[in-house]
Amino acid sequence: MAKDLTKAAEWYWHAALNGSKAAQNALGDCYYYGKGREENSAQAVEWYRKAAEQGYAQAQYNLGYCYYIGEGIARSVSLAADWYHKAAEQGHSEAQAAFGDCYRTGEGVTKNEASAVWWYLKAAEQGHVGAQCALGDCYRTGEGVTKNGTVAIQWYRKAADQGYAEAQNMLGICYHNGDGVAQDNREAVKWCCKAAENGLALAQYNMGFFCEQGVGGANKEDALGWYCKAAEQENASAQYKLGVFYENGYGVTQNKEEAAKWYKKAADQGDENAKKAIDKMQSSGLGSAAAAAAALAGVGLVWKILKG
């Protein structure tokens, strides 16, 4: 396989030197991903640029992305937006969604929520799940468009049905809150669970909450496991919850040191509840040196318990 990739890169090289914009973009990919060529993001940018300047939409998007994240070239959100725009004008759905993001956040362009919606719609109509979810957000909150919960649900569902975790989670939250749809906790649990199983930390936290509260028939005994999954992905709210569980012995052997560790992780991310919990432990004489040391330790104990 390695020989095949190297050979492919050689053919791309020859074609790229002869001016093939598709080959130039492909060679850029070889350098960017380290396939058939040693990984070199600066070289990737140069080949993307050659293709982009010939009007190749995928290369224009790739170059915009490199500018946006500052990989292989100095970061410039304005140049990122310029290249996204060029590709978006050619109907490139990923670029249309990215350009919509620029307008929504005001990165590289003057913030304009209505323009963001316009570009999201272009991408969403081509089946771009991220843009569909973003449209759901815009209709739910009234960003750049008249607020309409029913339409928000329609866009969330389009993306959720394609397995997009963020949309699945939002659909679950809308069902839980009765926002744009009849309140239904079983549907809420179903959709948040799909998102959680797809690895979305926020949805994993939500599932922990649903399980803890017994929402929609969720199993209370599963709460700890979901909070652990979210906490491992640095979700501060889940880290705080693990602290609560360990401090009080909810579903796990009571362990003040482990509680202090998780509270500290959450507090380090700015979680106010965790900061208050640490203050309370210290004022109660529970913030011992041992607990402080445990707070700085690794995160293996929870998984050891869960795995047996």
Language-model regions, residue ranges each:
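TPR/TPR-like (Sel1-like) alpha-helical repeat modules
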Residues: 84, 227, 254-272, 279
